[in-house]
């Protein structure tokens, strides 16, 4: 498999696989579809790239303080950048189910990673596209417990997958091990399908789902030495004391207390044992001798320094933060390089004018804000997710799009782009009105609904739901706690001061309560029966 650091051309396999014949559907078929500008043209293709845990602040098109991501910036520069993009449930499997179905978790049935299994019989946007004559393919992370449906071609990772020499489950029914680094391998498979396996007379929807940048942030060998001389700025909320926020205080995702010194920070030592040490040994045990030699050569001096100098207190906490940031950024670098390979292929084959290219993440992530790693909470860093698009000809919008969008909007967007009638039970809104014209629509949604279900579980984030508008956010933590939180995002963008119940907030609280009630009714969330809002 090609390494992203290899400047040689990608050698694609000489395979040709014909796609199944298109199935009849009641909606507009791709053979008669009109383009977004209402002129007859070829059906539009879709390339949907999604990463895992890539937070918006770690893309230079959103924030220039941390890392340069030239290929992701290229999408934003030549296309559109959504500045208010959010998820409905900030967790990997549930987010993927929302994206596939266009429905909130309580409707698609996949509430949590630990307790849910995706019902593959339910409608998804790939199934609708497939029936309309599109070829559909997915390569990479799936993470929904059942095998993919609605795809003509798929190869997926078992569970989270491995960064080095990963296993892939193939639709032929077997499991294969591919040699190399996962992000490059997924890109290889995707480009191979574009070049050699698809029927080039038909439109396609290609889903490229990366494991990167998921914990435990293991870089490619060629990127190991990057960022070692960089000291990243410590977030101003790093030493948050969680005053007035008992649910935030109860989490187990602190960089200082909960990062595993071996599994996460890679400080392997024969005399030190941790909860996740055996898992880490299994992970690095997948490396071949050359990969392991490069890995050990990089980390051993850092390990020696760590156990020699025995940092404590603030010094240790900030050392962990810097190690976490550096490893995360190395994985981002590989990801950006591989996105560039996809963009280069599409450009070299004159496909960009007829292809919607989407880049996003399954959710945001904490990079030391509030002292945390991971996601789950409705707070901004994890509810927000990056979303940039390269638009085909006929879609006129460029630059920043400030309207609030959510990952349940992707499915109806893809269907409308393909000329397929959006089913009434999809809860998301098609983004096509935001993309067609230079100025966008006069009216759009004014709030978003969120519901996180996975508790008790890893990181111990309490169950909660809430509503966010353009200024305020109201949340209710429930189950073994009954805690309301209200934030003024204009005055308190870091969400440090819970103003729920404070004098002078009665009118704001009442207004947000009614928005929350309306959202729960609109999306038919049964939680409203257990915790009714008057």
Where are these regions (language model features)?
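Residues forming the ATP-binding cleft of Hanks-type serine/threonine protein kinase domains
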Residues: 490
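Formylglycine-dependent sulfatase
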Residues: 2-3, 10-18, 22, 28-478, ...
């Amino acid at each position: 498999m090609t390494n992203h650091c290899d400047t040689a051309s990608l050698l694609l396999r000489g395979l040709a696989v014909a796609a199944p014949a298109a199935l009849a559907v009641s909606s507009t078929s791709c053979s008669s579809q009109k383009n977004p500008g209402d002129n007859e043209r070829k059906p539009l293709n879709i390339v949907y790239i999604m990463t895992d845990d890539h937070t918006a602040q770690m893309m230079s098109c959103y924030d220039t303080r941390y890392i340069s991501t030239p290929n992701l910036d290229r999408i934003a520069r030549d296309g559109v950048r959504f500045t208010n993009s959010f998820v409905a449930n900030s967790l990997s499997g549930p987010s993927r189910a929302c994206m596939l179905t266009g429905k909130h978790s309580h409707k698609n049935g996949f509430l949590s990673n630990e307790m849910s299994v995706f019902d593959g019989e339910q409608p998804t946007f790939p199934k609708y596209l497939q029936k309309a004559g599109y070829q559909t393919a997915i390569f990479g992370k799936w993470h929904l417990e059942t095998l993919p449906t609605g795809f003509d071609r798929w190869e997926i990772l078992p569970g989270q997958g491995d960064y080095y020499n990963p296993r892939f489950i193939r639709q032929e029914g077997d499991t294969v091990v591919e040699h190399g680094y996962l992000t490059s391998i997924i890109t290889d498979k995707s480009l191979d399908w574009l070049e050699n396996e698809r029927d080039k007379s038909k439109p396609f929807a290609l889903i490229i789902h990366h494991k990167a940048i998921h914990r435990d942030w293991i870089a490619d060998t060629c990127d190991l030495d990057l960022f070692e001389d960089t000291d990243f700025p410590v977030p101003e909320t790093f030493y948050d004391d969680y005053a007035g926020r008992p649910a935030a205080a109860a989490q187990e995702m602190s960089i200082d207390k909960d990062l595993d010194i071996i599994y996460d920070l890679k400080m392997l030592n024969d005399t030190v044992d941790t909860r996740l040490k055996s898992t880490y040994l299994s992970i690095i045990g997948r490396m071949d001798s050359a990969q392991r030699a490069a890995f050990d050569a990089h980390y051993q001096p850092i390990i020696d320094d760590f156990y020699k100098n025995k940092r404590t207190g603030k010094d240790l906490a900030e050392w962990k933060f810097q190690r976490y940031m550096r490893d995360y950024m190395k994985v981002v670098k590989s990801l950006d390089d591989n996105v560039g390979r996809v963009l280069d292929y599409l450009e070299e084959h004159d496909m960009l004018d007829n292809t919607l290219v989407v880049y996003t993440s399954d959710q945001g992530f904490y990079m030391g804000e509030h002292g945390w790693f991971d996601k789950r909470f409705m707070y901004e860093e994890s509810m927000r997710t990056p979303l940039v698009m390269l638009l085909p000809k006929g879609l006129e919008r460029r630059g920043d799009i400030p309207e609030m969008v959510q990952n349940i909007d992707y499915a109806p967007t893809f269907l409308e782009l393909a000329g397929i009638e959006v089913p009434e039970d999809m809860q998301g809104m098609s983004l096509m009105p935001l993309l067609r014209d230079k100025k966008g629509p006069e009216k759009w949604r004014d709030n978003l609904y969120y519901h996180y279900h996975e508790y008790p579980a890893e990181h111990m984030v309490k169950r909660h739901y809430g509503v966010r508008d353009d200024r305020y956010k109201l949340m209710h933590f429930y189950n073994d706690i009954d805690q309301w939180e209200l934030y003024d995002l204009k005055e308190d963008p870091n969400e440090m001061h819970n103003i729920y119940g404070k004098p002078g907030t009665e009118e704001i609280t009442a207004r947000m309560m009614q928005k929350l009630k309306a959202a729960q009714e609109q999306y038919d969330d049964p939680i409203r029966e257990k915790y009714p809002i008057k």
